[in-house]
């Protein structure tokens, strides 16, 4: 079983709340508190991780910690965000199912940091090929880029996400990231034009102002932060810095991240120019026009600067802000006229344009990231949801309403999958179970999204009526929901608030601005202005139309519901999102996104991280009991603890259980083809013989349930051991197969090489045979021995000296390092006194050596060189015309070499071939005479050849004492050689095997 070395000095409380001795809310709170005080910010409730924001660096992240958690089960190791990431990754690999990690909690609870640690872990444990590294780097670098454009300092969090993000990482079959996709939700674009006192605008604005060089500041017409209306609005002193955030360093990181995701320098410049233009838009002020019924821009120079940054005409910019083009009529009767805007209307248009430009720019950056990690194939994914937490402010508007709505739906998922579905599953499977009560927030979700009578539906309907306003909207809400358990109206003289009783508590919403923000109106004049820009970025972001998924069946149901409930047909029709005459409302678009998100989450195996904000002061390790208790309550942690405490830590269908563990059972291996349930019973029966787990296991109708992790550890250990054994066996068989395959291939190669070498030898022998024929045919009588040429003879090393170290060393010393022995044989030499002397002949690739053997000496020598003749010194070689074996090598400016050998044909043929190669094709000269004149050490000498019919006496001087073909006898000044008649000179050499 895998083990983990725990730090006993940090053994505070219990790591898993299921192990609490006393199960109560107070003991749960106390356990979280004492662990948090000791810096132990992670605690689990079975598979659910509870994470508490420490507000300081703890040193519990990095490669060392990653290695500790890699491949470990959550039961084996202390709870950690890495453990959740590893569990999701292992499940994706082993089960082949999509996974999602849902991180929830209120603003400032540490959700964004948790998501970054998850990304870091996945990047660290996966492959390192060039493409995988590129994808991982892009995914990691997308975080600082999105934080720059989507995060801001709020009263509760210095790095608060002001948008929602669902990051899907797609993996290939090898388990490495091959791409991904980011979906963003509801950017808080109203922050661009207005922030609460003590808060900041989006980080990127301060990064741009603080991190730009002097040249960039001049290029983009940048000012100091306190000179921008959009950065100081509603803030008496302005808030331009944030603890723990360095805007100058952040700007460098943002630029680098842009480069990584494919935003090049020219595009970066357009983005920064657009950001500067957005800030300067806020400084535009308007005066009443001379006619008094319109408005004009008060600072034309500023308008020119903005127009220059945006690549538009300054006059058209002013016209688009201070007037609207209205079209009436249809077809040929359509007419267009300009309507002047009041100062207030012009300011509204200015702010709407700034918000829309920034929002579209943010969407563009998300698209650029997605393009850089896009994959065409469909694979398994791990999704990480980092979405804004539940928010309750002094003034809660449309943004908080949407944020709390999505948190309400996420809470419903948690309830469905961890409390409701789990208990229902026990009942359906026939498992003995005592129900645990919990708070179901479905009624609150229905209050917001139900059709046709839900807050979002009524809001969209009210936006359709020209006379609709915030007051008529709240009147309608009070009318329809006055008796709803999750809705309350506020009894005040000015009725501008309503209350929703969320799972996290009651929230007072201010209706002011709801309709405007839902309509999200941007006049066509401003869209036309942007699309006429010389800046390609502005044109692209304003022309881009996001895809909208519309379910035709749901659309028909919506239309029918409106008709049945007495709403006007026109209103019903215009509410349907496919009606191009009406813009899609922000609320409707957000609801569609939430629906799509829920569909994705429900299609995955979920993992939960519940984040808790310990205090509102953002102080390290400070514990606010009431605040934490409130979060524990609305997150449903105690109810989750009760279900997990009484429930089962593991459940799986019989078929999937068999697929994973069938190899460890004697009766189920190597293949189980019977009923899966029967197989599981047999397998667990064998396990029960080893340890008593009868009380730990229950069998449902379709699933097996295991209460505690110990049997799982045993199962996994057995499986790992079995897999190792099988891997060893497979490896052994594979090695044997590979070895045999290698042996057979080697054997075949040897045979092929041998055959090829034999073929080459035959070809060379045939060539040499033909060469010998060209030398001797019609020039010299032949004897039977000389015309029979064996293939082995042409190898030439008759004395087997090629591997003799002394011979090799001597030849290299005499001739040079390139000397190679080509021929060695025994010969007879005719001395100056015409006596026959024994010699050995060595031929290299450029020299002839005659040697005489002697007794081996201590230095290894065993012969002496008597004569050294370079090929270049050979003048010619002479032979008789008879069938003898004598020949003379005539040497330039030296005495000649008179030799005799019965291997004359092979020697001369090979020598002729080597001579020609060494002297660049020069042919060796051969002479055939009845007598041969030559020079020995004493002077001129001669070989005289006499053909005789028979040989009656054997001369002691004969080189071939036992040869019947010729004899040699020394005379005074010559050597007489008597030769029997031989074969015809026309006889051809033939090849024999031996």
UniProtKB/Swiss-Prot annotation:
Residues 12-720 form the Myosin motor domain. One of its GO terms (biological process) is actin filament organization. Keywords: Actin-binding, ATP-binding, Calmodulin-binding, Motor protein, Myosin, Nucleotide-binding, Repeat. ATP binds at residues 105-112. InterPro entries: IQ_motif_EF-hand-BS, Kinesin_motor_dom_sf, Myosin_head_motor_dom-like, Myosin_TH1, MYSc_Myo1, P-loop_NTPase. GO terms for molecular function: actin filament binding; ATP binding; calmodulin binding; microfilament motor activity. One of its GO terms (cellular component) is cytoplasm. It comes from the Eukaryota. Residues 782-970 form the TH1 domain. Residues 574-654 are annotated as: Actin-binding. Residues 723-744, 745-774 form the IQ domain. Actin-based motor protein, possibly involved in a wide range of motile processes, such as cell movement across a surface, and extension and retraction of pseudopodia or lamellipodia. Belongs to the TRAFAC class myosin-kinesin ATPase superfamily. Myosin family. Myosin I heavy chain is single-headed. Dimer of a heavy and a light chain. Inability to self-assemble into filaments. PANTHER family: MYOSIN (PTHR13140), MYOSIN IA HEAVY CHAIN (PTHR13140:SF655). This is Myosin IA heavy chain. It comes from Dictyostelium discoideum (Social amoeba). The gene is myoA.
């Amino acid at each position: 079983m895998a083990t983990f070395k725990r730090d006993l000095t940090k053994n505070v409380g219990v790591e898993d709340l299921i192990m609490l001795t006393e199960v109560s809310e107070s003991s749960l709170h106390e356990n979280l508190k004492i662990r948090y005080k000791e810096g132990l910010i992670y605690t689990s409730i079975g598979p659910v991780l509870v994470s508490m924001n420490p507000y300081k660096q703890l040193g519990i992240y990095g490669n060392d910690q990653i290695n500790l958690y890699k491949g470990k089960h959550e039961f084996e190791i202390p709870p950690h965000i890495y453990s959740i990431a590893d569990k999701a990754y292992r499940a994706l690999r082993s089960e082949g199912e999509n996974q999602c990690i849902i991180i929830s909690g209120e603003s400032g609870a540490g959700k964004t940091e948790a998501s970054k640690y998850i990304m870091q872990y996945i990047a660290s444990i996966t492959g390192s090929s060039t493409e995988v590294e590129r994808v991982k780097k892009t995914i990691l670098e997308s975080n600082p880029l999105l934080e720059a454009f989507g995060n801001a300092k709020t009263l509760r969090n210095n790095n608060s996400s002001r948008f929602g993000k669902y990051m899907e990482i797609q993996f290939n079959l090898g388990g490495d990231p091959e791409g991904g996709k980011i979906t963003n939700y509801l950017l808080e674009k109203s922050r661009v034009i207005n922030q609460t006192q003590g808060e900041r605008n989006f980080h990127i604005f301060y990064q741009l102002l603080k991190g730009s060089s002097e040249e960039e500041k001049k290029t983009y017409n940048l000012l100091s932060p306190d000179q921008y209306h959009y950065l100081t609005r509603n803030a008496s002193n302005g808030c331009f810095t944030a603890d723990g955030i360095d805007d100058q360093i952040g700007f460098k990181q943002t630029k680098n991240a842009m480069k990584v995701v494919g935003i090049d320098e020219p595009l970066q410049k357009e983005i920064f120019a657009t950001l500067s233009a957005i800030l300067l838009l806020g400084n535009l002020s308007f005066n009443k026009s001379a006619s008094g019924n319109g408005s004009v821009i008060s600072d034309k120079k500023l308008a020119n600067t903005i127009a220059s940054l945006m690549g538009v005409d300054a006059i058209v910019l002013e016209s688009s802000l201070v007037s609207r083009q209205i079209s009436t009529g249809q077809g040929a009767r359509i007419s267009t006229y300009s309507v002047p805007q009041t100062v207030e209307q012009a300011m509204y248009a200015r702010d709407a344009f700034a918000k829309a430009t920034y929002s579209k720019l943010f969407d563009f950056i998300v698209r650029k990231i997605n393009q850089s990690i896009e994959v065409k194939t469909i694979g398994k994914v791990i999704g990480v949801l980092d979405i804004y937490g539940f928010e309750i402010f002094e003034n809660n508007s449309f943004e908080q309403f949407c944020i709390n709505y999505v948190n309400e739906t996420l809470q419903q998922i948690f309830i469905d999958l961890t409390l409701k579905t789990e208990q229902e599953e026990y009942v359906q499977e026939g498992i003995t179970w005592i129900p645990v009560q919990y708070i179901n927030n479905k009624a609150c979700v229905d209050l917001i999204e139900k059709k046709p009578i839900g807050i979002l539906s009524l809001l969209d309907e009210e936006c359709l009526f020209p006379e609709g306003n915030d007051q008529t909207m709240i009147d309608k809400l009070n009318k329809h929901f006055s008796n709803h358990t999750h809705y309350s109206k506020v009894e005040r003289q000015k009725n501008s608030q309503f209350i929703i009783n969320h799972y996290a508590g009651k929230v007072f919403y201010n209706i002011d601005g709801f309709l405007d923000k839902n309509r999200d109106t941007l006049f066509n004049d401003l869209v036309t202005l942007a699309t006429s820009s010389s800046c390609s970025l502005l044109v692209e972001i304003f022309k881009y139309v996001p895809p909208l998924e519309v379910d035709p069946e749901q659309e028909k149901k919506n239309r029918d519901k409106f008709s049945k409930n007495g709403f006007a047909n026109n209103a019903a029709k215009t509410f349907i999102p496919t009606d191009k005459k009406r813009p899609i409302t922000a609320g409707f678009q957000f609801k569609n996104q939430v629906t799509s998100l829920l569909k994705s989450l429900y299609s995955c195996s979920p993992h939960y991280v519940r984040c808790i904000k310990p205090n509102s002061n953002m102080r390290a390790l400070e514990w606010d009991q009431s605040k934490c208790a409130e979060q524990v309550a609305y997150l449903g942690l105690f109810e989750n603890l009760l279900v997990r405490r009484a429930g089962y830590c593991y459940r799986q269908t019989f078929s999937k259980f068999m697929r994973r563990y069938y190899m460890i059972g004697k009766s189920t291996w190597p293949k189980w083809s019977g009923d899966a349930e029967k197989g599981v019973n047999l397998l667990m029966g064998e396990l029960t013989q080893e340890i008593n787990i009868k009380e730990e296991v229950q069998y449902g109708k379709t699933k097996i349930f295991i209460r505690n992790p110990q049997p799982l550890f045993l199962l996994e250990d057995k499986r790992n051991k079995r897999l190792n054994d099988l891997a060893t066996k497979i490896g052994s068989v594979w090695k044997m197969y590979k070895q045999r395959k290698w042996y057979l291939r080697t054997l075949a190669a040897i045979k092929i090489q041998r055959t090829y070498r034999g073929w080459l030898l035959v070809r060379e022998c045939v060539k040499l045979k033909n060469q010998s024929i060209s030398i001797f045919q019609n020039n010299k009588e032949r004897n039977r021995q000389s015309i029979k040429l064996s293939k082995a003879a042409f190898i030439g090393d008759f004395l087997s000296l090629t591997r003799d170290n002394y011979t090799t060393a001597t030849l290299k010393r005499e001739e040079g390092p390139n000397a190679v022995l080509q021929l060695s044989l025994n010969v007879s030499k005719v001395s100056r006194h015409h006596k026959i002397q024994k010699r050995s002949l060595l031929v290299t690739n450029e020299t002839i050596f005659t040697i005489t053997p002697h007794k081996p000496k201590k230095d290894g020598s065993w012969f002496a060189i008597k004569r050294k003749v370079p090929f270049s010194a050979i003048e010619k070689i002479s032979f008789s015309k008879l069938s003898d074996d004598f020949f003379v090598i005539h040497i330039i400016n030296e005495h000649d070499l008179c030799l005799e050998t019965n291997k004359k044909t092979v020697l001369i043929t090979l020598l002729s071939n080597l001579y020609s190669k060494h002297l660049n094709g020069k042919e060796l000269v051969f002479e055939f005479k009845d007598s041969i004149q030559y020079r020995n050490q004493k002077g001129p000498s001669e070989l005289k050849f006499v053909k005789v019919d028979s040989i009656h006496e054997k001369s002691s001087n004969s080189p071939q004492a036992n040869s019947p073909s010729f004899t040699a006898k020394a005379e005074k000044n010559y050597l007489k050689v008597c030769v029997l008649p031989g074969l015809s000179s026309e006889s051809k050499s033939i090849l024999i095997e031996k």
